[in-house]
Amino acid sequence: MNNEKELKKEETSVENKEKKVATEEIKKEKKDYKKIIQDLEKQIESCQKEIEFQKSLRNADIANLTKKRNEQEALVRKYGSSNLAEDLIKPIDLLKKVVETPTDIPELQNYLMGFKMIISQIENAFETNGIKAMGVKAGDEFDSSFHEANESLENSGMESNKIVSVISDGYMIHDRVLIHAIVKVAK
């Protein structure tokens, strides 16, 4: 019986040791899992920060693209009629010269009066859209930004670099030159 008791004690002792070893292994595994979980949480946090950073970059890109598109749309609205205006200005300038031709024929004077009214309406439409004549005159200073010299004249009786005569007026669309004024310049 003593043997049996000792055997039971030993069995209990072995069982306790096995339980203790198993408990220690579980605790160790639990620590390992906690470390793995902490590492994964750090990775998740790092990924979330990277996602937020990338989102902020994309939002900035979208804002910049929107701003650029709005600026381009504004430019198109502001200067979009340039080609049409260029095509219309030359015939209108010719019509102005025809209208300025003196005549004694009353019927022709009536037509010329009607053409002057049409020219005036077209010029008003141009001005409404930011297109206007430069109003270059003889005696103005020549500026290659606005004027195109068709001819340089010596002994014109004017100072050098002054406009002697205007062949055709120039036009601006808002702050840009649409058509340069064609002029004769004193040397």
Curated annotation (Swiss-Prot):
Q: Which GO terms describe its cellular component?
A: cytoplasm
Which GO BP terms apply? Answer: protein folding
Which branch of life, at top level? Bacteria
Question: Could you tell me the keywords of this UniProt record?
Answer: Chaperone, Cytoplasm, Stress response
Name the Gene3D superfamilies on file. Answer: 3.90.20.20, Head domain of nucleotide exchange factor GrpE (2.30.22.10)
UniProt-annotated stretches for the region Disordered: 1-23
Instruction: Give the matching HAMAP family.
Output: GrpE (MF_01151)
Subunit and interaction comment: Homodimer.
Q: Which family does it belong to?
A: Belongs to the GrpE family.
Record function comment:
Participates actively in the response to hyperosmotic and heat shock by preventing the aggregation of stress-denatured proteins, in association with DnaK and GrpE. It is the nucleotide exchange factor for DnaK and may function as a thermosensor. Unfolded proteins bind initially to DnaJ; upon interaction with the DnaJ-bound protein, DnaK hydrolyzes its bound ATP, resulting in the formation of a stable complex. GrpE releases ADP from DnaK; ATP binding to DnaK triggers the release of the substrate protein, thus completing the reaction cycle.
What is the name attached to this protein's record? Protein GrpE
- Underlying gene: grpE
